[in-house]
Amino acid sequence: MRELPEFPWDVLLPYKKRAAAHPDGLVNLALGEPVDATPDVLRDALAAATDAPGYPPTEGTPALREAAAAWLRRRLGVTVDPSAVLPAVGTKELIAWLPAMLGTGPGDTVAFPRLAFPTFDVSARLAGARGRPVDSPLELGSEPVKVVWLNSPSNPEGRVLSVPELREIVAWARDRGAVLVNDECYIEYGWDRRPVSLLDSAVCGGSHDGLLAVHSLSKRSNLAGYRAGVCSGDPALIGRLLQVRKHAGHAVPAPVQAAMVAALEDDAHVERQRDRYAYRRRVLRTALEGAGFRVEHSEGGLFLWATRGEPCWPAVQKLADLGILVAPGAFYGEAGEQYVRIAFTATDERIAAAAARLT
């Protein structure tokens, strides 16, 4: 394992303290953490499954795998066999350990976007591999690479890759025998452009060989506190992950698996949450642009990627003086040093407070 970086949210604590001193209180737009209530149908399913004296199946209950496969088909137009679905104890742990679980190690390369969720870099470090930030995997050419991370819609900038872009990357990865993984945790939150799954037949030609897609229930279902996600795709890769996870004890608790079934079977709560986020996004974007920020990309996901042409840390401090906490773009790579990432996951009241302070 290579040395790990400092945990980014620890670095932000002094700015959080500064923002919290505002007379009207803190508006936390940094983390992107769900704040709306977990839907009753999910909580009821969890409560009904709390008599769980035995160990849960690492591969997931049949009901969970079938619900996930049905959700993929219904919402994303993707066909997978339920056996090619694997639950995760939240997708962050899966992302962090996936290269290592697939046998990646010293001398191997793990590629990820130049602007990226920090855990992609951590996944290379935990495997002892070399992390390679790229604007596009295609720039690697014939350079050997073991695992390639995509993130569409992306965090932090909210970019959505098109079908032709994804198709070209799939062909490139297959030519080199690289495992290609798309973190699709924001796929149900496309705004200006419709996100498409890596497993869509228009992208992969109907074959999932060498491909995996990772889906989080934290954002779509307000389940961050439950730690729940799924991975699907190439059955052989899913099988390899399952074997490691069985040995490591990476099983989702049985009550959480029951709640996941309820979440994946119900679309109504997702549409309600989309409406909430669409409203908050609109209010916040208008206020930011009125305050001189330029919002770039942000076509999908739960963040606005914004700049006023100044370094990110002074921008973070100025916003903290207004009682608004945001994430510095430098957390996501050198290419983000002129940007801040602003989440619209706070309550309507806190979003309104932020908008008022920006005007």
Curated annotation (Swiss-Prot):
Family annotation (InterPro entries): Aminotransferase_I/II_large, LL-DAP_aminotransferase, OxyQ, PyrdxlP-dep_Trfase, PyrdxlP-dep_Trfase_major, PyrdxlP-dep_Trfase_small
GO molecular function, one term: pyridoxal phosphate binding
Cofactor: pyridoxal 5'-phosphate
Binding annotation for substrate: G32, K92, N155, R341
Protein's pathway: Antibiotic biosynthesis; oxytetracycline biosynthesis
Cell membrane found in the keyword field: no
UniProt KW Secreted keyword: no
GO BP, one annotated term: antibiotic biosynthetic process
Enzyme class: transferase
Free-text disruption phenotype from the record: Cells lacking this gene are unable to produce the tetracycline intermediate anhydrotetracycline (ATC).
N6-(pyridoxal phosphate)lysine PTM positions: K219
Residues that bind pyridoxal 5'-phosphate: T91, K92, N155, Y186, S216, L217, S218, R227
Pfam family name, one: Aminotran_1_2
EC nos: 2.6.1.-
Keywords: Aminotransferase, Antibiotic biosynthesis, Pyridoxal phosphate, Transferase
Assigned protein family: Belongs to the class-I pyridoxal-phosphate-dependent aminotransferase family.
Known role: Involved in the biosynthesis of the tetracycline antibiotic, oxytetracycline. Catalyzes the conversion of 4-dedimethylamino-4-oxoanhydrotetracycline to yield 4-amino-4-de(dimethylamino)anhydrotetracycline (4-amino-ATC).
Name this protein carries in UniProt: 4-dedimethylamino-4-oxo-anhydrotetracycline transaminase OxyQ
UniProt gene name: oxyQ
